[in-house]
Regions:
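Flexible "cap/lid" loop of the alpha/beta hydrolase fold
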Residues: 106, 114-144
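Short beta-strand/loop motif that positions the catalytic acidic residue
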Residues: 210, 216-218
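Active-site loop/oxyanion-hole signature of alpha/beta-hydrolase fold enzymes
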Residues: 52, 56-92, 262
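Conserved alpha/beta-hydrolase "acid-adjacent" motif
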Residues: 223-229
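Conserved alpha/beta-hydrolase catalytic His-Asp/Glu region
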Residues: 148-201, 206
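Catalytic active-site module of serine/aspartate enzymes centered on a nucleophile-bearing elbow/loop
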Residues: 240-271
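Short glycine-enriched nucleophile-adjacent loop
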Residues: 98-109, 115
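Conserved HGGG/HGGXW glycine-rich cap/lid loop of the alpha/beta-hydrolase fold
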Residues: 6-62
Length: 271
């Protein structure tokens, strides 16, 4: 996997397929490899050259000392786009990756042709706030947590029927049962970024100044970014499109990759 040193941090990335460039930004604690079992193959088949990368704090990218901010992550993504010489390009992100893309759309419109914000563009819920504090404080403990900590947290998002599906559970375990200890500087850094972001009350002002085309994708059963909150953001971003996918949780890109990819490709075909 190639890498680039941006903002003093080595960021590991990969390029898939050929066509118009599209950068995918990962969620918190999510490895770039996870795109491979969700929407990445579908976007490549649709004719995009897809760039994936591991955020700072996620191996094999560097994990500088905590804390981080979402602005740090967005600056890394912007610098990677500049390093690759692909801007302005389309960007899409899930969860924390959605926050990164939101900042890129607002602050670096010179690099962004259009942005898809998946399960993350919304006024913060009380659940998001307390969840972020819990994650940060857990990551700061001077103890070694099980390597399965991340996957056990993720599985709680899924409906009971999905947890009873051995193939689905095995897939999540293979992706998110970390090879490195759960408690590490990168994990703490990313959770610290989540705390700052979820307690930021200035989002509506940022939404109002976004000038690039934006798609917000929400999932019916998402407790982090519930549809009623996502619709508030969609109404506040000038000209934003909104798609809601039924029957999915916060992990919608893994549950219904076809529907998510269709929403993105339909939107990007117009922008």
């Amino acid at each position: 996997m190639p890498d680039a040193v941006v903002n003093g941090v080595r960021i590991a990335y990969d390029v898939h397929g050929e066509g118009d460039p599209l950068v995918l930004c990962c969620g918190l604690g999510e490895p770039a490899a996870a795109w491979g079992v969700s929407i990445l193959p579908l976007l490549v088949d649709a004719g995009y050259q897809v760039v994936t990368f591991d955020n700072r704090g996620m191996a094999p990218s560097d994990a500088p000392p905590a804390p981080y901010t979402v602005q740090d992550h967005a600056a890394d993504a912007a610098a990677l786009i500049e390093h690759l010489g692909i801007g302005p390009c389309r960007v899409a992100g899930h969860s924390l990756g959605s926050w990164i893309c939101e900042l890129l759309a607002a602050d670096r419109p010179d690099l962004v042709r259009a942005a898809a914000l998946i399960a993350g563009c919304n006024p913060s819920t009380e659940w998001e706030k307390v969840s972020a504090i819990h994650g940060r404080d857990l990551a700061a403990l001077d103890v070694t947590l099980p390597r399965t900590q991340e996957v056990m947290e993720l599985l709680q998002y899924l409906p009971r029927a999905a947890i009873q599906d051995d193939e689905q559970v095995a897939m999540y375990v293979s992706l998110f049962a970390d090879e490195e200890p759960w408690t590490n500087p990168g994990r703490l850094g990313q959770w610290a970024a989540a705390v700052t972001w979820t307690h930021d009350d200035t989002k509506p002002q940022r939404w109002a100044r976004i000038s690039v085309p934006v798609l917000i994708v929400a999932f019916e059963h998402d407790i982090d970014s519930p549809p009623d909150h996502a619709r508030i953001a969609a109404a506040a971003i000038p000209g934003a499109a909104y798609v809601e996918i039924a029957g999915c949780t916060h992990l919608g890109p893994f549950e219904q990759p076809g529907q998510v990819a269709d929403a993105l490709t339909d939107f990007f075909a117009r922008h």
